[in-house]
Amino acid sequence: MTADAPAVLSLETAVYVIPTDAPEADGTLAWDKTTMLLVIARAGGEQGIGWSYTAAAAQSVVTDVLAGVVAGRSALDVAGAAEAMARAVRNIGRTGIAAMAISAVDIALWDLKARLLGCPVTSLLGRVRDDVPVYGSGGFTSYDEQQTRRQLTGWVEKDRIPRVKIKIGESWGSKERRDLERVALAREVIGPDAELFVDANGGYSTGQAVRVARLLADYGVTWFEVPVSSDDLAGLAVIRGQILPDVTAGEYSWSLADSARLIDAGAVDCLQLDVTRCGGISEFLRGAALAAASNLQVSAHCAPNLHAHVAAAVPNLRHVEYFHDHQRIEQMFFDGVLDPGGGVLTPDPAVPGLGMELRAADAERYRRG
């Protein structure tokens, strides 16, 4: 343990299940609730918080596997804890549930360290920008025209966010006509100046994605996220070579190796990273550096209030996804959430840690573990 540095005393966990405010669906999945794993790390009279949007099973990974290799370590030695956690999950697998559990703990440890040192996480990491660009994200395939109009108008007119994303690839790519009608609607609502992105969540085949992308050109779409499965590296590379919008993927990169495979395959124009899945802040920084070595930008996937600080410390950041479902939960559960007004999030340089405090009483009604 580092001299005079307090040791991590414990990792406490809670699982919350939060109903969505309306049925949500994308190209390949539908859901009506979201599960959050919350981790609280304690040391030196302070506590750090982290979370992941995952499954309840991640809680047992923290309590049964990770807590034992983190407790007792210096609260300042986050890198050592990250390495210990990665080694501890060898036999249960590094991807999926384990990666999301590790991510929640890692985030909590960075928050704790910054609070112990009395500085915001973004200053601890090394701030390169004050404001982090965001894009409004939702536009679910389950929405009707009125819901879509209301959401897009709120982002562009009320929040003044100059870039938005909607879901396409509905029903595994079987409703192309409705996909295109919804893209046309989105362009009508946001006007000619705002950027328009689409996300198929792997709903199309390779040839279908190329065909759809060419039709999207009429609407000025500049970002085509996961047109085919992110496991289909060859398909992504083929699509990237034949269409104008940037091809993006990476939200299911569970480790640095996953990000490396996307980059090495020439599969993406912009690498997506998710701090709640890739291994936390520690691995997000490494993934961003890996992308920079190939002259690629990175985009932060979902969980906007968790991404703001690390995003402000990444030179090759493009933007952060201001995802409807997650920003709603973060506003429900925490004080200190950031305002996206003007299309940016601005971490407060005067508030230590990640700058958020759990409103435990408000969250308690959703607690399931």
For every predicted segment, state its role.
Residues D130-I243:
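Metal-dependent enolase-superfamily TIM-barrel catalytic cores that perform enediolate-based chemistry
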Residues T2-T20, T34-M36, S299-G369:
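Flexible C-terminal active-site loop/helix
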Residues D106-S142:
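Glycine-rich, aromatic-flanked loop segments that form ligand/cofactor-binding clefts
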Residues V8, G45, L66, V105, ...:
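Conserved, mostly hydrophobic/aromatic
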Residues G27-D32:
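Short Gly/Pro-enriched turn/cap motifs at secondary-structure boundaries
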